[in-house]
């Protein structure tokens, strides 16, 4: 729906969901909201531990989370304190996150594969008081924990001998009746993820109780939820919970509706397919690299995947060719995309094929703006809002967006304008059916003699080639053109595809300025946990290639 209004003599084009706004109880603390209806499903499975097969009920997850909350208080963690989770997916991750919400503490999540320097930087910036991790990662935190630092470390597995490391059982054995009485304000921060930093240094994103409650409700609440999850669903959680997409759209949305959440520690294709078959997974949230692995898996036919009713993809755009490949392999499943950004809380748009009463959708679209929010497309140069079918920067406004970047008023001001609009840095357009199409990142566009070349477009073509497993396209400096597109390509097993083959394959499909200038073959495309290509690394590789 589009509202036109006059503002300083400039027409505003504002887009809303096709679904009506709903009542959202965003006065509730996050844990109270997630477990608001727990009496209806307290004896049902809440978490399934993929590594052990253990099934934990909603009643037990809530009880353990409250014990952990009391234990954290006993340990000296108070309202407003920050706890870092340096963990892979595990039940303990869930208990710690919910426990922090109970006592008004804040969780900052860190990638266990970070270097010690990256972990230390995040711990210092967030003023972390406690790190919960695995014994194998203790070396990453020893520089800034223990002794005079006052920062405690806790392991969820057996701590290394002779270390000061506490054990998670100290929390789970606490008395849940001793949770302190805290008054949680809806604007209090509950999660502090660090945005990927692909466009600068990582910054702490302040997500509040109100913001996350709003975001979850926008997805799964209402008579016709945009994302229809229910108590009988088994939701696959293979995407890392330290990333907001998984934390919000899988864990929190799953808890809210009483679904079972199947936790996998890490992605491994045969184990993933085995668990889908064993536990009859119904909802499969993926990122494009996993979608690609499933679509190209030669053993797919050996597994019964007929239980899957929904395949969600987010984190990075998924091309039409990849969509078609998945539809062919999983014809019974609904496939669609959502679009998110950590700072936006994170979901901006969601595929309406996922609704309880679904709408028709177009291939390549990444959904319609979520309900109870507004979206506009603005000209990156003038800031003017644009009508349908015109590409510009995507902006969103609503109670789900971040409070701001922690201790960085300037960066906050550069992202959220005075009107409350969050500027994403992504380029896209909204079509006549209210569907959003992402064209590319503002900063990733390749400029060939002034022509814009979108890497995502070329990447989807490359990936559709049977002899290519994965690909990324970045700009290379060129005296005549300014920039030309070059490809980094991962060959399929045993493939002998050449640079010349690739150039010809693309040149047949695109206008002259989009042709691939060079192709480099590599083992793996570097990506962040959400599946976004780390173009900085590839551009750095290019510089060394050109210097040779």
UniProtKB/Swiss-Prot annotation:
Coiled-coil residue spans: none
Annotated region (SBD1), positions in chain: 268-337
GO cellular component terms, semicolon-separated: cytoplasm; cytosol
Enzyme Commission code: 6.2.1.12
Record region (SBD2): 338-405
Record Pfam families: AMP-binding, AMP-binding_C
GO molecular function: 4-coumarate-CoA ligase activity; ATP binding; CoA-ligase activity
Binding site for ATP: 195-203, 337-342, 426, 438-441, 532
Catalysis performed (reactions): (E)-4-coumarate + ATP + CoA = (E)-4-coumaroyl-CoA + AMP + diphosphate
Localization (cell): Cytoplasm
Tissue: Mostly expressed in glandular trichomes (lupulin glands) after flowering, and, to a lower extent, in stems, leaves, cones and flowers.
Keywords: ATP-binding, Cytoplasm, Ligase, Nucleotide-binding
Pathway involvement of the protein, from the record: Secondary metabolite biosynthesis
PANTHER family, A to Z: AMP-BINDING DOMAIN-CONTAINING PROTEIN-RELATED, LONG-CHAIN-FATTY-ACID--COA LIGASE
Entry text on domains: Both substrate-binding domains (SBD1 and SBD2) are involved in the substrate recognition, and are sufficient to confer the substrate specificity.
Family: Belongs to the ATP-dependent AMP-binding enzyme family.
Free-text function comment from the UniProt entry: Involved in the biosynthesis of prenylated phenolics natural products which contribute to the bitter taste of beer and display broad biological activities. Catalyzes the ligation of CoA on (E)-4-coumarate to produce (E)-4-coumaroyl-CoA.
Protein name (database record): 4-coumarate--CoA ligase CCL1
Organism: Humulus lupulus
Gene encoding the protein: CCL1
């Amino acid at each position: 729906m589009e509202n036109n209004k006059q503002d300083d003599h400039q027409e505003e084009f504002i887009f809303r969901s096709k679904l009506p706004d709903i009542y959202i109880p965003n006065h509730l603390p996050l844990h109270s909201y997630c477990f608001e209806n727990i009496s209806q499903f307290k004896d049902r499975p809440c978490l399934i531990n993929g590594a052990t097969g253990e099934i934990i009920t909603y009643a037990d997850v809530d009880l353990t989370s409250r014990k952990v909350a009391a234990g954290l208080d006993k340990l000296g963690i108070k309202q407003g304190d920050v706890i870092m989770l340096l963990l892979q997916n595990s039940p303990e991750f869930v208990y710690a996150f919910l426990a922090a919400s109970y006592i008004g503490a804040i969780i900052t999540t860190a990638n266990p594969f970070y270097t010690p320097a990256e972990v230390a930087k995040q711990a210092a910036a967030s003023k972390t008081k406690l790190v919960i991790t695995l014994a194998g990662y203790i070396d990453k935190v020893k520089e800034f924990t223990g002794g005079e630092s006052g920062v405690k470390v806790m392991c969820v597995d057996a701590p290394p001998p002779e270390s000061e490391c506490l054990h998670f059982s100290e929390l789970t054995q606490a008395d849940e009746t001793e949770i302190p009485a805290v008054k949680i304000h809806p604007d209090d921060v509950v999660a502090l993820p660090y945005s990927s930093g692909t466009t600068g240094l990582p910054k702490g994103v302040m997500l509040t109780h109100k913001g996350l409650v709003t975001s979850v409700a926008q997805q799964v609440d209402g008579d016709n939820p945009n994302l229809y999850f229910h108590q009988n669903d088994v939701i696959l959680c293979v995407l890392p919970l330290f990333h907001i997409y998984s934390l919000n759209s899988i864990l929190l949305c799953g808890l809210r509706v009483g679904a079972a959440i199947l936790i996998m520690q890490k992605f491994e294709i045969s184990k993933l397919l085995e668990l889908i078959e064993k536990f009859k997974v119904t909802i499969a949230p993926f990122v494009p690299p996993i979608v690609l692995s499933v679509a190209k898996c030669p053993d797919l036919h050996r597994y019964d995947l007929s239980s899957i009713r929904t395949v969600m993809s987010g984190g990075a755009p998924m091309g039409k060719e990849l969509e078609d490949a998945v539809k062919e392999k999983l014809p019974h499943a609904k496939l669609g995309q959502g679009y998110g950004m950590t700072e936006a809380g994170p979901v901006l748009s969601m595929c309406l094929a996922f609704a309880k009463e679904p709408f028709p959708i177009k291939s390549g679209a990444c959904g319609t703006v979520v309900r109870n929010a507004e979206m506009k497309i603005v000209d990156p140069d003038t800031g003017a809002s644009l009508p349908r079918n015109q590409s510009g920067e995507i902006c969103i406004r609503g109670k789900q967006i971040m409070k701001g970047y922690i201790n960085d008023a300037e960066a906050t001001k550069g992202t959220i304008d005075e009107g409350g609009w969050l500027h994403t840095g992504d380029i896209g357009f909204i079509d006549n059916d209210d569907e959003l199409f992402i064209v590319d990142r503002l900063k990733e566009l390749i400029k060939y003699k002034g022509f814009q070349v979108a890497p995502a477009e070329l990447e989807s073509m490359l990936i559709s080639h049977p002899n290519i497993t994965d690909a990324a396209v970045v700009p290379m400096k060129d005296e005549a053109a300014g920039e030309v597109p070059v490809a980094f390509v991962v060959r399929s097993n045993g493939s002998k595809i050449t640079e010349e083959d690739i150039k010809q394959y693309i040149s047949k499909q695109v206008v002259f300025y989009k042709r691939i200038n060079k192709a480099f073959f590599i083992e793996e495309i570097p990506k962040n946990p959400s599946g976004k290509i780390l173009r900085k690394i590839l551009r750095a590789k290019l510089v060394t290639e050109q210097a040779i």
